[in-house]
Amino acid sequence: MAKEDSIEMEGTVVDTLPNTMFRVELENGHVITAHISGKMRKHYIRILTGDKVTVQLTPYDLSKGRIVYRAR
């Protein structure tokens, strides 16, 4: 899938799940399940509850996403 096909949205981490999965509430109110991208995992970027994050969603399944950025 090409990078242009993904949808990027802002959200807040609501809950931490096992296996580096997180429950993220998007700005529009939807709650999705998201995992950390490989580069964030490689650079040991920690994500805590309450962090503002940028999430990439695919048009095929809007209930799952990938966390690509954590706001400072």
UniProtKB/Swiss-Prot annotation:
CDD domains: S1_IF1. It is found in: Cytoplasm. Residues 1-72 form the S1-like domain. One of its GO terms (molecular function) is translation initiation factor activity. The keyword Hydrolase does not apply. Keywords: Cytoplasm, Initiation factor, Protein biosynthesis, RNA-binding, rRNA-binding. One of its GO terms (cellular component) is cytosol. The keyword RNA-binding applies. Gene3D superfamilies: Nucleic acid-binding proteins (2.40.50.140). SMART domains: S1. One of the essential components for the initiation of protein synthesis. Stabilizes the binding of IF-2 and IF-3 on the 30S subunit to which N-formylmethionyl-tRNA(fMet) subsequently binds. Helps modulate mRNA selection, yielding the 30S pre-initiation complex (PIC). Upon addition of the 50S ribosomal subunit IF-1, IF-2 and IF-3 are released leaving the mature 70S translation initiation complex. Component of the 30S ribosomal translation pre-initiation complex which assembles on the 30S ribosome in the order IF-2 and IF-3, IF-1 and N-formylmethionyl-tRNA(fMet); mRNA recruitment can occur at any time during PIC assembly. Belongs to the IF-1 family. This is Translation initiation factor IF-1. It comes from Nitrosococcus oceani (strain ATCC 19707 / BCRC 17464 / JCM 30415 / NCIMB 11848 / C-107).
